[in-house]
């Protein structure tokens, strides 16, 4: 039951009245976090998988791995993220600082979405180069073919075309 009482890789708990729901993960997946096997077997938050023969490596779902692995709220500042660019609601970026000048570090926001029946809150990828569509968004089924969600097969409507700054 520890899996259900904690959180899903840093996201809201998947507990249901003290018991694991169908989308809840197994405690053997990612160290002490509640992590679905699919997180380890494919990719998480649109970034490369940490899968090793069906099990997670020590790097999976740790709060310090925002840019190159699974992105958790604890490592991302969502308050600075804008939502005014791109195609489709909730896709955008924000600039660091308040001068209005383009910064070399852009917070690329990804919107709320559902993955394996679990709601993930907004998060940012801090980078001076635009992430690809599927790196930025752990896409919904309406955006990607389910077997490739979070990887490389987003439909164009999911992608952000109008916010690609020059570093």
UniProtKB/Swiss-Prot annotation:
Keywords tagged on the record: Keratin, Repeat
Question: Could you name the domain of life of the organism this protein comes from?
Answer: Eukaryota
**InterPro entries linked:** KAP
Tissue expression, as annotated, is:
Expressed in the middle/upper portions of the hair cortex, in the region termed the keratogenous zone.
Pfam families linked: Keratin_B2
MF terms in GO: structural constituent of skin epidermis
Q: What is the effect of changing residue 34 to S?
A: In allele KAP1.8B
Q: Please provide, in alphabetical order, the Gene Ontology terms of the cellular component aspect for this entry.
A: cytosol; keratin filament
Please tell me whether the keyword Repeat is annotated for this protein.
yes
Carries keyword Glycoprotein? no
Q: Which family does it belong to?
A: Belongs to the KRTAP type 1 family.
Q: What does this protein do?
A: In the hair cortex, hair keratin intermediate filaments are embedded in an interfilamentous matrix, consisting of hair keratin-associated proteins (KRTAP), which are essential for the formation of a rigid and resistant hair shaft through their extensive disulfide bond cross-linking with abundant cysteine residues of hair keratins. The matrix proteins include the high-sulfur and high-glycine-tyrosine keratins.
Q: Quaternary state and partners of this protein? A: Interacts with hair keratins.
Record's protein name: Keratin-associated protein 1-3
Q: Which gene encodes it?
A: KRTAP1-3
């Amino acid at each position: 039951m520890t899996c259900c009482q904690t959180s899903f890789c840093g996201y809201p708990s998947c507990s249901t009245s003290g018991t694991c729901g169908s989308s809840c993960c197994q405690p053997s997946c990612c160290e002490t976090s509640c992590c679905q096997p699919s997180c380890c077997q494919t990719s998480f938050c649109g970034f490369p998988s940490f899968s090793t023969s069906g099990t997670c490596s020590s790097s999976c779902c740790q709060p310090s791995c925002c840019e190159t692995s699974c992105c958790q709220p604890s490592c991302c500042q969502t308050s600075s993220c804008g939502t005014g660019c791109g195609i489709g609601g909730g896709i955008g970026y924000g600039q660091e600082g308040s001068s209005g000048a383009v910064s070399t570090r852009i917070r690329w926001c990804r919107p709320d979405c559902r993955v394996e029946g679990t709601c993930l809150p907004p998060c940012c990828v801090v980078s001076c180069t635009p992430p690809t569509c599927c790196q930025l968004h752990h896409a919904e089924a309406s955006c990607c073919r389910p077997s490739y969600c979070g990887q490389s097969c987003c439909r164009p409507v999911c992608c952000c075309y109008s916010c690609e700054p020059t570093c």
